[in-house]
């Protein structure tokens, strides 16, 4: 079955919301599964091929063609296979050097650290920037049940173990902090230092439960993302925009539905709204690259 063009972008963008929501849009209308070799040769705008792990998890993989000639991004990815799904990362600097592990948030990917990676590598560190499941060049399960907060935690812990990383200098941002801080707390002996940028510790106020699901996303009007209403590089995004910082679970439910279903949603819109310096169009396109 082929996706109607009106829904194609929603489908491939769905995992961008998964990191923050612990869920992804249920996708059932992709073409039949194909071999990984066929996937690797796809054009960037080709219809996704669904592949299946040995455990029966259906997933898609962003074609390599989507990541060519990105500005300030000369890095080739490495991969660790965890439960049949590829976890992508870049690994720069001396292999035996002190480790800096960089964790991005939502809806970005390791491209977020394009300015930091060369500086840290030139300073003599081994720099590892990982893409969370459903983000960047990592595999993207199509079932909403394949994403969870604890699942991201467990994958990160396995990733660290597979690479045999110790004495880690951890830098976390946004949802990378919620994932990374909990993981570091579970195995503190593996971590030497921790730095947090635009992040928070994991936890819920007393009495808070699971965010209620949106009952009918199809009737949700195209939620106006608050950041899009603010001129770029404006401090008031943090100081005066109460809706985006609203703690009402219902608002977060609306954000979930918007990020997973709205055709107007693009990662670059969110990143641009929260970036002090103006982003050139080529860099905005690079943030969107994983979700053509």
Per-range role (PLM):
Residues 2-20:
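Bacterial N-terminal signal peptides that target proteins for export
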Residues 15-32:
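Bacterial N-terminal signal peptides
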Residues 40-76, 86-87, 92-93, 99, ...:
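Flexible "cap/lid" subdomain of the alpha/beta-hydrolase fold that forms the substrate-access gate
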Residues 36-38:
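Boundary at the C-terminal end of the N-terminal hydrophobic targeting segment
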Residues 106-117:
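The serine-hydrolase catalytic nucleophile loop
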Residues 121-131:
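A fold-wide structural signal in alpha/beta-hydrolase
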Residues 101, 120-121:
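Hydrophobic alpha-helical packing residues
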Residues 102-105, 129:
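Structural cue for short, hydrophobic secondary-structure segments
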């Amino acid at each position: 079955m082929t996706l109607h063009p009106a829904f194609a972008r929603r489908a491939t963008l769905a995992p961008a919301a998964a990191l923050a929501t612990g869920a992804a849009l249920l996708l059932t209308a992709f073409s039949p599964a194909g071999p990984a070799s066929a996937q690797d040769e796809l054009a960037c705008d080709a219809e996704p091929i669904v592949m299946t792990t040995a455990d029966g998890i259906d997933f898609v993989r962003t074609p390599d063609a989507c990541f060519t000639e990105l500005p300030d991004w000369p890095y080739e990815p490495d991969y660790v296979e965890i439960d049949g799904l590829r976890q992508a990362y870049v690994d720069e600097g001396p292999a035996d050097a002190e480790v800096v592990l960089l964790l991005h948030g939502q809806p970005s990917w390791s491209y977020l650290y394009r300015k930091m990676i060369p500086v840290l590598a030139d300073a003599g560190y081994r720099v590892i920037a990982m893409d969370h499941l459903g983000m960047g060049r990592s595999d993207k399960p199509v079932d909403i049940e394949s994403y969870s907060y604890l699942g991201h935690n467990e994958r990160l812990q396995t990733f660290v173990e597979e690479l045999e990383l110790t004495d880690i200098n951890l830098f976390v941002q946004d949802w990378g902090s919620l994932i990374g801080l909990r993981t570091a707390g579970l195995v503190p002996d593996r971590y030497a230092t921790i730095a947090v940028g635009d992040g928070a510790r994991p936890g819920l106020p007393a009495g808070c439960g699971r965010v209620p699901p949106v009952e009918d996303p199809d009737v949700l009007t195209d939620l106006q993302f608050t950041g899009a209403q603010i001129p770029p590089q404006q401090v008031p995004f943090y100081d005066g925009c109460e809706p985006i910082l609203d703690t009402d679970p219902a608002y977060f439910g609306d954000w979930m539905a918007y990020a997973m279903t709205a055709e107007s949603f693009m990662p670059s819109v969110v990143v641009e709204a929260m970036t002090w310096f103006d982003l050139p169009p080529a860099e905005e396109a690079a943030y969107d690259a994983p979700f053509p």
